[in-house]
From Swiss-Prot:
Any one GO molecular-function label of the UniProt entry: citrate (Si)-synthase activity
UniProt protein name: 2-methylcitrate synthase
Entries under InterPro entries matching the protein: 2-MeCitrate/Citrate_synth_II (IPR011278), Citrate_synth-like_lrg_a-sub (IPR016142), Citrate_synth-like_sm_a-sub (IPR016143), Citrate_synthase (IPR002020), Citrate_synthase_AS (IPR019810), Citrate_synthase_bac-typ (IPR024176), Citrate_synthase_sf (IPR036969)
Function per UniProt: Involved in the catabolism of short chain fatty acids (SCFA) via the tricarboxylic acid (TCA)(acetyl degradation route) and via the 2-methylcitrate cycle II (propionate degradation route). Catalyzes the Claisen condensation of propionyl-CoA and oxaloacetate (OAA) to yield 2-methylcitrate (2-MC) and CoA. Catalyzes the condensation of oxaloacetate with acetyl-CoA.
Catalytic function, reaction form: propanoyl-CoA + oxaloacetate + H2O = (2S,3S)-2-methylcitrate + CoA + H(+); oxaloacetate + acetyl-CoA + H2O = citrate + CoA + H(+)
Encoding gene per record: prpC
Length: 375
């Protein structure tokens, strides 16, 4: 690595890899802000469309700007016939993140970014189209139905649920999906976002950057924690069973997903927000078992390991109460985080230098080639 500055720590933990004006994560041990606004404030007082506008365009919209933005996004929900045909060829047992990756890449073939002047338009298009992509594939491959991907729903969260279930969602479900999308919208230099920025630093197109980010999120160490949490809690009978199951896993030193975080030291601010909504959903659902066992898991993990729930853990029960199949949990993350990814791509482009770090060589010493007859 010669004169390059030495970066230490597994996975470059604690290292600064650049500057961003989009978000802060864990500055006080537990905080999360988007362009200066606390995520709790946004979740309580804004919609996801307002937050998307904030992240992509820099400020919260006025009433007129929000109305125009919602109208724009609603007009971008439809999918090209060629993309639908590709989605119909993807089997039902495919990994849904592969569907998202393929859908994004195919859209890039059909609606290519010819100039960076189109970047905001493409960011909005991806934000509007991603729920349509995953739901069109799911409904066709699992139900044999070719759905109309354009609905009159005012919000993206409601639109997703409408496409998935074939009917308009309740006010409660609409609100919870809206909050969920806000909580997942942006999170600084995580693995998928940094992947998008590295790709952007080569001056690649927006679809390639986002496709790369999806590929990064597909890995189980980054995405999928809410799916793993659902697999953990779904068969727990009650609080006592939850404690027994978790204690067994701890004794066997098994990794338990949905707890702790790479950046937050004290708590994940998103957890308390979605936990509250999960409790409300449980009451509405009429069976609070999954919520109760989740609370028991949370208490035990803190008691035994001093590990707090991250954003993913109570999302599992919340999504379940809204009738969302477990395999679609991570694609919902994509439908939200595409906001942050595309904003980071644009930020990288605005003050760009190709990201090309050095590496410490740990291989063999210099040597000579031995003729093949003598090896």
């Amino acid at each position: 690595m010669s004169d390059a500055k030495k970066l230490t720590g597994a996975g470059l933990r604690g290292q600064s890899a650049g500057e961003t004006a989009l978000s802060t994560v864990g500055v006080s041990g537990s905080g999360l802000t988007y362009r200066g606004y606390d995520v709790k404030d946004l979740a309580e007082n804004a919609t996801f469309e307002e937050v998307a506008y904030l992240i992509l365009y820099g400020e919260l919209p006025t009433t007129a700007q929000l109305a125009a933005y919602k109208t724009k996004l609603k007009g971008m929900r439809g999918l090209p016939q060629a993309l639908k045909e590709v989605l119909e060829r993807i089997p039902a047992d495919a990994h849904p993140m592969d569907v998202m990756r393929t859908g994004c890449s195919m859209l890039g073939n059909l609606e290519a970014e010819h100039s960076f002047s189109e970047q905001s338009q493409i960011a909005d298009r991806l934000l509007a189209a991603f729920p349509s992509i995953i739901c069109y594939w799911y409904r066709f491959s699992h139900d044999g139905v070719r759905i109309d991907t354009e609905t009159d729903d005012d919000q993206i969260g409601a639109h997703f649920l409408h496409l998935l279930h074939g009917k308009a969602p309740s006010a409660l479900h609409t609100k919870v999906m809206d909050v969920s999308l806000i909580l997942y919208a942006e999170h600084e230099f995580n693995a998928s976002t940094f992947t998008a920025r590295v790709c952007a630093s080569t001056l690649s197109d927006m679809h390639s950057c986002v496709t790369g980010a999806i590929g990064s999120l597909r890995g189980p160490l980054h995405g999928g924690a809410n799916e793993a949490a659902m697999e953990l809690i779904q068969d727990m009978k009650d609080e006592a069973d939850a404690r027994d199951v978790l204690m067994g896993k701890l004794e066997r030193k098994e990794k338990i997903m949905g707890f702790g975080h790479a950046i937050y030291r004290d708590s994940d601010p998103r957890n308390a927000i979605i936990k509250e909504w999960s409790e409300k959903l449980a009451a509405d659902y009429g069976d609070d078992r999954l919520y109760r066992v989740s609370v028991a898991c949370e208490a035990l993990m803190w008691e035994q390991k001093k590990l707090f729930c991250n954003a993913d853990f109570f999302h599992a029960s919340a999504y379940h109460f809204m009738g969302i199949p477990t395999k679609l949990f991570t694609p919902i993350f994509v439908c939200s985080r595409v906001t942050g990814w595309t904003a980071h791509v644009m930020e990288q482009r605005s003050n760009n230098r190709i990201i090309r770090p050095s590496a410490d060589y740990v291989g063999v010493s210099p040597r000579k080639v031995i003729p093949i007859a003598n090896r």
